[in-house]
A protein has these predicted regions:
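Active-site neighborhoods and metal-handling regions in enzymes and metal-associated proteins
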Residues: 1-215
Length: 215
């Protein structure tokens, strides 16, 4: 046999294939982590593809902001991003994370037929697989009517501070541990509803690494 090793790492495989390989004496391992770590470093061509996906996502985001108005449903607003992606040669969207008003907390709820009310905050996460199959994962929050009340302004400015602080930290050679130690500290009142991670990789989809909040 040309396969001298008895261990084989595969990223995607079905059950019957694993069984068949096992019968020949080959032990199958999950290659996901190996492949994800290899995908961390992007080629110049990949970076161009990622920028193209981001550009399309930003076009869609701007259209959503312009067309947001009281009386439309969350689904109607979300459809603008999907339409824009397809119009520009994009592929698909992983999910439909968009919510308004009280539905924004807890986070991660998908768009619905809820009617957006005047002055409500609207938050969404694109998770958009755009042109060339690369993902643009961008979160944004708008307010219907574009006039923030004091509570909305406080939360929004806190989010901006959070993102800017952590973005400035990132540099070549920094360990995950150092990043975690120097990262922006969530106020105690919001820690319980924190996101699953502070930062994560991106490429064909959400990718490794994923750096969690300190506990």
């Amino acid at each position: 046999s040309y396969c001298k090793s008895k261990k084989l790492a595969i990223d995607v495989i079905n059950g019957p294939a694993v069984t068949a390989l096992n019968k020949t004496g080959i032990e199958v391992f999950d290659a996901k982590l190996i492949v994800e770590q290899a995908r961390v470093i992007k080629s110049p061509e990949e970076l161009k593809c990622m920028k193209a996906a981001i550009e399309v996502a930003e076009i869609g985001i701007n259209k959503m902001r312009e067309e947001l108005k009281a009386g439309m449903t969350e689904d109607e607003l979300w459809s603008i991003l999907h339409k824009t992606n397809i119009e520009h040669g994009g592929e698909w969207i992983e999910c439909r994370i968009l919510s308004s008003g009280q539905r924004t907390n807890p986070w991660m709820q998908e768009s619905s037929n809820k009617v957006i009310q005047r002055g409500e905050i609207v938050s969404f996460d694109t998770d958009m697989v755009g042109p060339y199959g690369y993902c643009a994962d961008i979160s944004r929050a708008f307010v219907e009517g574009h006039k923030f009340n004091e509570d909305q302004k406080k939360l929004y400015l806190m989010a901006v501070e959070h993102i800017n602080h952590n973005s400035r930290l990132i540099k070549p050679g920094m360990s995950f541990k150092e990043f975690t130690e120097k990262s922006w500290k969530l106020p105690d009142e919001y820690y319980g509803n924190r996101y699953s991670c502070m930062v994560h990789g991106i490429g064909l989809c959400d990718e490794w690494p994923m750096i969690r909040y300190p506990t």
